[in-house]
Amino acid sequence: MTTVIYPGTFDPITNGHMDIIQRSAVLFSKVIVAVAKNPSKQPLFNLAERVELVQLSVVHLGNVEVIGFDDLLANVVKARQIDAIIRGVRTTMDFEYESQLAHLNRLLTNGVESLFLPPTEQWSYVSSTIVRDIFLHQGDVSRLVPAAVLRALEKRAK
């Protein structure tokens, strides 16, 4: 059984994230979506809310588990005996940054590899930052996020 982890802040989870999760769920026995608490970011949704939104978004995927974490990713990888780290890369800038993290994670986990998945073309422009910006300017994000996220955003707007 191959277990992979897909870490991120997912603030909020987007259809681009869902693309990576769904494709990973086909490729691997188990996918753990690890929702990170990042003290250097001011999130739109707190950690518990983000975990819940991801859970609601992946409920149809039987081999996907969602966890929240505020530890070093390498520690989570070692504790859960993860086989590989999944990262989505949209641009060459993403690739350069993720390559640095992959080298560090490989060192800190005694060899666990990072696998880079580009998004399908349909979602190559979508990011949580863009979704938040559109939402904060009262734009329509309904085609960019799962239904549970849209409901949470609409509730937040009231």
From Swiss-Prot:
Q: What Pfam families does the annotation carry?
A: CTP_transf_like
* Compartments, as annotated in UniProt: Cytoplasm
Q: Which SUPFAM superfamilies match?
A: Nucleotidylyl transferase
Give UniProt keywords alphabetically.
ATP-binding, Coenzyme A biosynthesis, Cytoplasm, Magnesium, Nucleotide-binding, Nucleotidyltransferase, Transferase
Query: Which residues of this protein are annotated with the site description Transition state stabilizer?
Result: H17
Superkingdom per UniProt: Bacteria
> Which cofactor is recorded for it?
Mg(2+)
Q: Which pathway does UniProt place it in?
A: Cofactor biosynthesis; coenzyme A biosynthesis; CoA from (R)-pantothenate: step 4/5
The reply on keyword ATP-binding is: yes
Q: Which GO terms describe its cellular component?
A: cytoplasm
Q: Which GO terms describe its biological process?
A: coenzyme A biosynthetic process
Task: Please state which protein family the record places this protein in.
Answer: Belongs to the bacterial CoaD family.
Kindly provide the name given to this protein in its UniProt entry.
Phosphopantetheine adenylyltransferase
Q: Which organism is it from?
A: Histophilus somni (strain 129Pt)
